[in-house]
Swiss-Prot record:
<dbReference type="GO" id="GO:0102130">
    <property type="term" value="F:malonyl-CoA methyltransferase activity"/>
</dbReference>
<comment type="similarity">
    <text>Belongs to the methyltransferase superfamily.</text>
</comment>
<keyword id="KW-0093">Biotin biosynthesis</keyword>
<comment type="pathway">
    <text>Cofactor biosynthesis; biotin biosynthesis.</text>
</comment>
<dbReference type="GO" id="GO:0009102">
    <property type="term" value="P:biotin biosynthetic process"/>
</dbReference>
<keyword id="KW-0489">Methyltransferase</keyword>
<dbReference type="InterPro" id="IPR011814">
    <property type="entry name" value="BioC"/>
</dbReference>
<dbReference type="InterPro" id="IPR029063">
    <property type="entry name" value="SAM-dependent_MTases_sf"/>
</dbReference>
<dbReference type="GO" id="GO:0032259">
    <property type="term" value="P:methylation"/>
</dbReference>
<dbReference type="InterPro" id="IPR013216">
    <property type="entry name" value="Methyltransf_11"/>
</dbReference>
<protein>
    <recommendedName>
        <fullName>Malonyl-[acyl-carrier protein] O-methyltransferase</fullName>
        <ecNumber>2.1.1.197</ecNumber>
    </recommendedName>
</protein>
<dbReference type="GO" id="GO:0008757">
    <property type="term" value="F:S-adenosylmethionine-dependent methyltransferase activity"/>
</dbReference>
<dbReference type="Pfam" id="PF08241">
    <property type="entry name" value="Methyltransf_11"/>
</dbReference>
<keyword id="KW-0949">S-adenosyl-L-methionine</keyword>
<dbReference type="GO" id="GO:0010340">
    <property type="term" value="F:carboxyl-O-methyltransferase activity"/>
</dbReference>
<dbReference type="InterPro" id="IPR050602">
    <property type="entry name" value="Malonyl-ACP_OMT"/>
</dbReference>
<comment type="function">
    <text>Converts the free carboxyl group of a malonyl-thioester to its methyl ester by transfer of a methyl group from S-adenosyl-L-methionine (SAM). It allows to synthesize pimeloyl-ACP via the fatty acid synthetic pathway.</text>
</comment>
Length: 258
């Protein structure tokens, strides 16, 4: 199943992997939104048993473990070594791969179900990601993915704009762009808005740190700054009813492999 011709190294991906590795110890407790999104994603398909499931961007293996307990054979893949260590410690899968979703070291048509929850927004090119998922999935198989679309983290982005002119939030594709990329495939997409409210800015920032979502593609870290700048950010934040809201434009997708 595993291809021998595998090589991937990039500064961006190394930095992303490091951010998630630093969060490996806190991820399981902090990833409430990721778990909620993952279970909604599962509702898009019925039970799949006695199949090879690829959990692409598995994190600490929460959903790998779910698939394995359903009787599937699971391959857990992540860019972060520390995340994979956590997954392996709980025996979440039968096999583990430290690899990049955009360069899957897997032979063609070896996977029955490709599952990727809240991971592909960290990739360089969604076209490449979906092409790789399609390549490794067998005819008759299914690809399930969730990701973030434009408008996610908008409150944090708007607050930072009032502090300085530097980008502090990664750009997300619009829903229309994601639809266009999925056009070559037999696919179904839906988007819904989810808002998470925090009692203070510190809790909000900590929630991002807790799941490793602090890497900015241009080389800075999201939301990390001096105390004075954080105070300015807090003053600029659009507080509603005493709470700090954070929006997520969630996209759920299913691709049927012909």
């Amino acid at each position: 199943m595993i291809s021998k011709n595998f090589f991937i190294e990039s500064v961006n991906k190394t930095a992303i992997a490091s951010a998630f590795s630093r969060a490996a110890h806190s991820y399981e407790q902090a990833a409430s939104l990721q778990k909620e999104v993952g279970f909604r994603l599962l509702q898009m398909t019925g039970d799949i048993k006695k199949s090879w499931v690829l959990d692409a961007g598995c994190g600490t293996g929460y959903f790998s473990q779910f698939w394995r307990q359903k009787g599937n054979r699971v391959l857990s893949l992540d860019l972060s070594f520390e995340m994979l260590k956590k997954a392996k410690k709980k025996s979440a899968a039968q096999a583990y791969l430290l690899a990049d979703i955009e360069h899957l070291p897997i032979l063609d048509q070896k996977i029955d179900l490709c599952f990727s929850n809240m991971a592909i927004q960290w990739c360089d090119d969604l076209k490449v990601v979906l092409a790789e998922f399609h390549r490794v999935t067998r005819s008759g198989g299914v690809i399930l993915f969730s990701t973030l679309a434009m408008g996610s983290l908008k409150e944090l982005a708007q607050a930072w704009q009032k502090v300085d002119e530097e980008p502090h939030i990664n750009r997300f594709l619009s829903f229309e762009e994601i639809q266009q990329i999925c056009t070559p495939y037999h696919s179904e997409l839906k988007m819904c808005l989810s808002k998470v409210c925090f009692p203070d800015l510190r809790s909000l920032i900590q929630s991002l740190r807790g799941v490793g979502a602090t890497h900015l593609h241009r080389g800075r870290k999201v939301g990390l700054s001096s105390r004075a700048r954080i105070q300015k950010l807090e003053n600029a934040y659009p507080v509603k009813f005493g709470e700090y809201p954070l929006s997520y434009q969630l996209v759920y997708g299913i691709i049927y492999r012909d």
